Amino acid sequence: MIMKKFVSFRVLSLTLIAGCIFKTTSADADVSFIGVAAGDATTTDVIVWTRAKDEANPQPTAINVQISQDPTFNTGVTTFLAGTAGSPTDYTVKANVNGLNSGAIYYYRFQTTDGSVTSNVGKFKTAPNPTGDAPVHFAFSGDCDGLIRPYALASQVPAKNLDFFMFDGDTEYETSASIGSPAVHSTGNIPDPTVTVPTATQSQLFDDFSRKYRQQLLPVNVDGQNCLQPFFAGQGNYTAYDNHELGNKQYINGGAPAGGGVGSTTGSPPFDFATGAGVDARNSANDVTPNDGSVPFINKSGGFQTLQQVFENYQPIKERGLINAPSDPRTNGTRQLYFAQQWGRHVIFVNTDCRTYRDIRMKTAANADDTGPRADNPNRTMLGATQLAWLEQTLLDADQAGTTWKFINISDPIDEIGPIGGSLALVNPPTTAEYGTLGSITSIVTTGSTNNTRTVTVGTTVGLVVGQGVSGTGVPANTTISAINTDGATFSINNNATIATGVTLALTPAPSTYAPVTSDGGKSWMGGYRAERNALLKFIADNRIYNVVFLATDDHQNRINELLYSPNGQTGVQASYVKVPYCFEIVCGPLGATGPDLISNHSFSLVKKLADSIANAQLAANLEPIGLAGYPGLHQVRRLGDPQADALRQPVDFYSPDTFNYNVLDVGNGGKTLTVTSYGINSTVQNGFVEYDPVNNAEQALFSFKIQRHP
């Protein structure tokens, strides 16, 4: 029966997405693959991806892909040319495979055309028939900082046998603090890009960011986890980008003014991006970019488009072409990254693009986020007019078609944590000591002399932590580690010292520097784009679109919140806010990034004290506290460490700030119930290169709850 079903499968067409096609002249046996991925699945097609290169003798290489419903590839195998791996895409290959059966599991792998080298095997599932009564089982998270490689938690995701995973941004970090991974060249300056800084060329951006994506797929320990390779192969994925894919400076604001010419989008490389890198974020005149074509947008600049292209090279993303919106210059001619996909009769998944069109992230004179009245400007946008109209119509159409659950992926939170334009005054928060101390290594031996400098040479710096105290012969009092250098063999200290080779240094733990999220930053909807946020939520409320769940990451904590809006549009007046009916947000993650690592005390009592301090401060400020305590249809609340979770439904039952985590969402047959389960591990230290530990730090269900649909 299985064979008969597979025989009916045929590849109707295969679209090559590998840049230029080259004649292959390389010795295929020397080619190596670093990972496979599949993504953007529909009912009938999917994107498959790999990278293949002969590192010793790089040259274009033709690559085949094999598809089968047999995981052993012993039966029913279809083989065809996927494309050519070459330098224009940093040797990545993508192919769009069509003609698949709906709601079916497939396996795939890549080979050189002579069959001498084969990649690992990947797995994906196509979306079920949009009218079928199908259960849906998916997960999401984001934020993978090289400081936390090899991303131990990510290795556990494939065991969940997901229909798909939503990788919600910050799929790499451009920063320099990760051992063995130097920083990228600068992409500009914040808040004023006119300040002279070394500015990357096109080739530098392409090479630097390609390297960062590659490193997300390579092991950091001998015979260790291949970072995100097992994760990508384990299920099909959807992907969004956020600030770190765009360099975390002015390019993160695709809809902001380019600041002069858009840079070299034409001409001969290397291009110099001294222009087209933005404007002064402190100047309120730049808060809204005119949408009449008079001012060029950052999303048209050479730097932005280079970073966007590298992101697409390294993700299994369907290339949907350029948007035709002549009445919307902000959007017209940009790559379409946003889309919606129906998963059976009861679920629609919507993936938005929250970076390409957004207005500038506003700054104060002191270079802090300006989240005050400037954020209430009704002309400011995060999504752009074309995407916002599309999103609203997509939600309306889905609701009118009877789709029960509407999941909207956004890369930045849309809930409200702190008072408008300000921060919470926490009530009885944990002390620094209660968060715990950092750094378990107590001594280390120098392997080189330090002659009145601030650089100490040792065998390895893996596992050392900034802030640890250092003492020993030649070390001044009150010396601490100030930086872990990327060479993996040196660290910096805060004092000059003369230390001989072979000296044993004593190390003391570092105090925690954890700072809770107590406000809505300028990157968030509430902190920087309040009017458009309000318009979207008002549209949902006014049209009685129920069972809407926003999915977000980027705050490096897991929390669940109801959403409030101002029916009369008074976005700067807290008293005007009311709840959006049957609508909430899940903020998830990180899968492996900083923030949670600054908490080493993982006790339930510590997390409860922190959650209570935030919730009490929110109540004092007339804000809705963390959690879903009064949400209609809420039942079966579970929380690790809290046997009374379903009875009390406290803020801590919907909150995890100290873990690496992802959330699994299940919609059962009939679409009546949504189940949300947070899975995670205790956070680990930066640059510790910690592998998954099933004995001492096993994945656990942190919390879970069920929501009954309405009506």
Please describe what each predicted stretch is.
Residues 1-2, 20:
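Short, low-complexity interaction segments enriched in Ser/Thr/Pro/Gly
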Residues 5, 28-29:
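Serine/threonine-biased, Pro/acidic-interspersed low-complexity stretches characteristic
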Residues 19-26:
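C-terminal segment of classical bacterial N-terminal signal peptides
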Residues 21, 473, 680-683:
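Short, flexible beta-strand-to-coil junctions
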Residues 30-440, 467, 508-711:
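Long, structured stretches of catalytic cores involved in phosphate-ester chemistry, encompassing
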Residues 438-513:
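Small/polar beta-strand repeat architecture
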